[in-house]
Amino acid sequence: MYKIEKVSPDVVRPLRHKVLRPNLPFEASCLPSDNDPDAIHFTLKKDDTILSVASLYSESLEAMPNKNAYRLRGMATEPAKQRKGFGAMVLHGAMDHLKKETDVEILWCNARVT
């Protein structure tokens, strides 16, 4: 059974480093806003194995500065588990949390293909 959990930033960093910044020092996986009070970090797990992670930060969108916005960053899925929908699952869990627990109006991101 799959489970989405809200976690500390230390929990998401190993997978974030492995997938997004493997050729950089581990510290490169620490994003500047990781410990902000409004930062939220999620894992998707099966049993005790983390399959996917995502982090959300309270950050306005330049094109809509008057809207309450969160930014998605540091999203990663275990390489052997990619293309199976796990990224979508953790993202939907994060969006459900925002809808229930915040007054956010916009969720935005900058995307890259790795």
Region annotations inferred by a language model:
Residues 59-72, 82, 101-105:
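A conserved beta-turn-beta hairpin within the catalytic core of GNAT-like acetyltransferases
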Residues 1-13:
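A short beta-loop-alpha structural element at the N-terminal edge
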Residues 11, 113-114:
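Short alpha-helical
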